[in-house]
């Protein structure tokens, strides 16, 4: 069965046809509407989906935010702008005329990455470090989503009780410090206004403050992984996202994790599917692959 998979992110929308063997074809991208209004997103999704829907039998959506009864919600409402409570599933069912499933993008990516691991792995955690910090947990071969869709939102665990206020309302969340947005917000002096990509470039050039911001992010993620290991006893952790996959970042996370006591050590690896993980994971779930 061919699935029309859609990935809704903060900066871009992606769609592709995915067959039962996870082969991707006709991948398309559009920028996420800057206005973040329901009408703008509806029109963008229509333009994205229209050329593909005739060849699909179902729709699978991986989206930023929390998916609750087909509705788009968020711990950090600022991430969604005017899209809070957007009827995501109903909208796609109307546009495509096909049965539709929706899941959080990090949860979907976790499911895809889990399927790329050896068969003896039953417990794993996926962490994406990008504009924000998200995650997905697979326990005993089952993806944990939670009744309210909240499971795996690891970026909103505590990193520093005296840290910056997070958009979710808590103080010192991992996301507020370690994410690309958090790093950029902490940049000062000649780095003020720089995005995460620029900070990594400047860090590579030896800029002291940029190196500190990248290192601080990696250390916060490593400590979070130690907490995750203690909570889930996972066999491995897979790291993805634009920050997580940046050159040299995983090595720093690994080095900081090794400074933690031995019981908290866990195998780390880079995401295999990279920017297609959400599409593939959503397609797997829509195809009924819930083990």
UniProtKB/Swiss-Prot annotation:
UniProt pathway annotation: Amino-sugar metabolism; N-acetylneuraminate degradation; D-fructose 6-phosphate from N-acetylneuraminate: step 2/5
GO MF annotations, alphabetized: ATP binding; N-acylmannosamine kinase activity; zinc ion binding
One GO BP annotation of this record: N-acetylneuraminate catabolic process
Keyword Transmembrane helix appears in the UniProt entry: no
This protein's UniProt keywords: ATP-binding, Carbohydrate metabolism, Kinase, Metal-binding, Nucleotide-binding, Transferase, Zinc
PROSITE patterns, A to Z: ROK
Presence of keyword Metal-binding: yes
Xref: Pfam families: ROK
Source domain of life: Bacteria
Listed EC numbers: 2.7.1.60
SS bonds (residue pairs): none
Recorded catalytic activity of this chain's protein: an N-acyl-D-mannosamine + ATP = an N-acyl-D-mannosamine 6-phosphate + ADP + H(+)
General function of this protein: Catalyzes the phosphorylation of N-acetylmannosamine (ManNAc) to ManNAc-6-P.
Subunit record text: Homodimer.
Official protein name in the record: N-acetylmannosamine kinase
Classification lineage: Bacteria, Pseudomonadati, Pseudomonadota, Gammaproteobacteria, Enterobacterales
Gene assigned in the entry: nanK
């Amino acid at each position: 069965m061919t699935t029309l998979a859609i990935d809704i992110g903060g900066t871009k929308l992606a769609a592709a046809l995915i067959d039962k063997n996870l082969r991707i074809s006709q991948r398309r991208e559009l920028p996420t509407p800057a206005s973040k209004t329901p009408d703008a997103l509806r029109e963008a999704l229509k333009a994205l989906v229209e050329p593909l829907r005739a060849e699909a039998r179902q729709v699978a959506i991986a989206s930023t935010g929390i998916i609750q009864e087909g509705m788009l919600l968020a711990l950090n409402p600022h991430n969604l702008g005017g899209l809070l409570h957007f009827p995501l599933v109903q909208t796609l069912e109307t546009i495509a005329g096909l049965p539709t499933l929706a899941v959080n993008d990090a949860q979907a990516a976790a499911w895809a990455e889990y399927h790329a691991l050896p068969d003896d792995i039953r417990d794993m955690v996926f962490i994406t470090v990008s504009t924000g910090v998200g995650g997905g947990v697979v326990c005993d071969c089952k993806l944990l989503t939670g009744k309210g869709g909240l499971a795996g939102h690891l970026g909103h665990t505590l990193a520093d009780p005296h840290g910056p206020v997070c958009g979710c309302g808590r103080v010192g969340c991992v996301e507020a410090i370690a994410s690309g947005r958090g790093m950029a917000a902490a940049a000062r002096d000649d780095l003020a206004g720089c995005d995460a990509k620029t900070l990594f470039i400047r860090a590579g050039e030896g800029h002291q403050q940029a190196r500190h911001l990248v290192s601080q992010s990696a250390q916060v993620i490593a400590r979070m992984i130690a907490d995750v290991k203690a909570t889930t006893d996972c066999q491995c952790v897979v790291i993805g996202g634009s920050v997580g996959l940046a050159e040299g970042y995983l090595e720093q996370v690994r080095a900081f994790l090794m400074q933690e006591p031995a019981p908290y050590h866990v195998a780390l690896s880079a995401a295999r599917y990279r920017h297609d993980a959400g599409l593939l994971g959503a397609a797997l779930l829509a195809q009924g692959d819930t083990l």
